[in-house]
A protein has these predicted regions:
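A metal-dependent hydrolase signature that marks the N-terminal structural subdomain at the beginning
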Residues: 1-116
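Active-site scaffold of zinc-dependent metalloenzymes
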Residues: 113-163
Length: 165
């Protein structure tokens, strides 16, 4: 069954299939990611505030180290929130067929899966009043991709992670 103009579950499954697995994601190398980004994100926020004068009224940034599937899930939630008003309006005038919802899901799933293999992090500021605040205003770090880039270019992990933050 479809959930309107986009079959969100199909998009999620396709994206995860395209994303694949990064071998380093299950290694001991990932153990320090959570600790490092918990320390470096507030540190980077202070450096930016000192340099620009920009200070968040909402408090300190919240960091979350996730895998590719987590990044896909977060972005599907964001797309659903962002597109909800447009899709609701469209549904009343142009009801979606099963075929169009599958095509939309395939397009979205392929793009998100491809992007999940390349993105290192993301600041998600999509705020809506009717959603859980713990799901919004986050800095995501895609752990497997960060580990892969560190290895590929022989970056010093601490320096690279602070730079990302």
């Amino acid at each position: 069954m479809t959930d309107g103009p986009v079959d969100w579950e199909l998009a999620r499954r396709l994206a995860r299939k395209v994303a694949g697995d990064e071998p380093l994601s299950c290694s001991y190398l990932g153990d320090s990611l959570h600790e490092d980004f918990a320390r470096f994100t507030p540190m980077a926020e202070e450096l930016v505030a000192a340099e620009t004068g920009l200070v968040s009224d909402e408090g300190s940034a919240r960091a979350r180290v996730i895998d590719r599937a987590g990044w896909i899930d977060a972005n599907i939630r964001a797309f659903r929130r962002l597109l909800r008003p447009v899709l609701a309006e469209s549904a009343s005038t142009h009801p979606a067929s099963v075929v169009t919802s599958k095509i939309a899901a395939a397009e979205l799933g392929m793009v998100l899966g491809w992007m999940s293999r390349r993105v290192l992090g993301q600041y998600d500021l999509l705020l809506t009043e009717d959603e859980d605040r713990d799901d919004q205003d986050l800095v995501y770090y895609v752990g497997p991709n960060i580990l892969s880039i560190e290895k590929k270019f022989a970056f010093d992990p601490k320096q690279f992670r602070l730079w990302l933050a």
